[in-house]
């Protein structure tokens, strides 16, 4: 199973943790966006959207990390704990995944990426939106050990990849009691946690320049 990725990428790390959780071995194919490797004709044949992560499972190509995570959990999961079959439980997992994609991760990117990649000054409005997003997550976790209920799901893995990226960026998670407690636990409990840690160390370099 080929996996086109960058180790520092939060979406890529989410997939790697999910693969670890279901016991799938990935054939890692480092894809350097800075060198334009995602624009090579052979990669465009696989993924015309030319983005990572991209998974190829016996000829079946899929991209968008959360779609890949649900695919791996459904096809290779030994049970439905990671991605429950119960419609309401699954709906909550989906909501958290979409929240991560559209709000939590997106607002991190909106605030930090212009500073990192375009050397622009910090935008206070985007900073507040980012803080609001972590506040929403804090509310979700009030009274719960995991982000989508009472057991670890792929939503925890996806959001761990994002929140650990917040952490290495220097965002103060201590102000969000439930997020901080969840993060302290999940970074030890999550399958593939060591892979995630190695990846965020790679991403951390962007904040040391």
UniProtKB/Swiss-Prot annotation:
Single GO term (MF): glutathione transferase activity
Entry annotated with the keyword Transport: no
Domain GST C-terminal, residue spans: 86-207
UniProt cross-references to CDD domains, sorted A to Z: GST_C_Delta_Epsilon (cd03177), GST_N_Delta_Epsilon (cd03045)
Residues involved in glutathione binding: 9, 50-52, 64-66
PROSITE patterns, sorted: GST_CTER (PS50405), GST_NTER (PS50404)
Keywords: Lyase, Transferase
Residues of the GST N-terminal domain: 1-80
This enzyme's EC code(s): 2.5.1.18, 4.5.1.1
Superkingdom of the organism of origin: Eukaryota
Catalytic reactions of this protein: RX + glutathione = an S-substituted glutathione + a halide anion + H(+); 1,1,1-trichloro-2,2-bis(4-chlorophenyl)ethane = 1,1-dichloro-2,2-bis(4-chlorophenyl)ethylene + chloride + H(+)
One matching Pfam family: GST_N
Gene3D superfamilies found in the cross-reference section: 1.20.1050.10, Glutaredoxin (3.40.30.10)
Chain's role: Conjugation of reduced glutathione to a wide number of exogenous and endogenous hydrophobic electrophiles. Has DDT dehydrochlorinase activity.
Sequence similarity: Belongs to the GST superfamily. Theta family.
Subunit structure: Homodimer.
Record's protein name: Glutathione S-transferase 1, isoform C
Origin species: Anopheles gambiae (African malaria mosquito)
Organism phylogeny: Eukaryota, Metazoa, Ecdysozoa, Arthropoda, Hexapoda
């Amino acid at each position: 199973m080929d996996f086109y990725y960058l180790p520092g990428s939060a979406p890529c790390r989410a997939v790697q943790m999910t693969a670890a959780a279901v016991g799938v071995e990935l054939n890692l194919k480092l894809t350097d966006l800075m060198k334009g490797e995602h624009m090579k004709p052979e990669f465009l044949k696989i993924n015309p959207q030319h983005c990572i992560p991209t998974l190829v499972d016996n000829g079946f190509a899929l991209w968008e990390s959360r779609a890949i995570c649900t695919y791996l959990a459904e096809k290779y999961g030994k049970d439905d704990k990671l991605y429950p079959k119960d419609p309401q439980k699954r709906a909550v997992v989906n909501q958290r995944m979409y929240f991560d994609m559209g709000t939590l991760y997106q607002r991190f990117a909106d605030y930090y990426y212009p500073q990192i990649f375009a050397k622009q000054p910090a935008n206070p409005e985007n900073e507040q939106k980012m803080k609001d997003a972590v506040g929403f997550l804090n509310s979700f976790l009030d009274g719960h050990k995991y982000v989508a209920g009472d057991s670890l799901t792929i939503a925890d893995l996806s959001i761990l990849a994002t929140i650990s990226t917040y952490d290495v960026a220097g965002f103060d998670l201590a102000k969000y009691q439930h997020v901080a407690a969840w993060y302290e636990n999940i970074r030890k409990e999550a399958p593939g946690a060591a892979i995630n840690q190695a990846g965020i160390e790679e991403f951390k370099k962007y904040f040391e320049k």
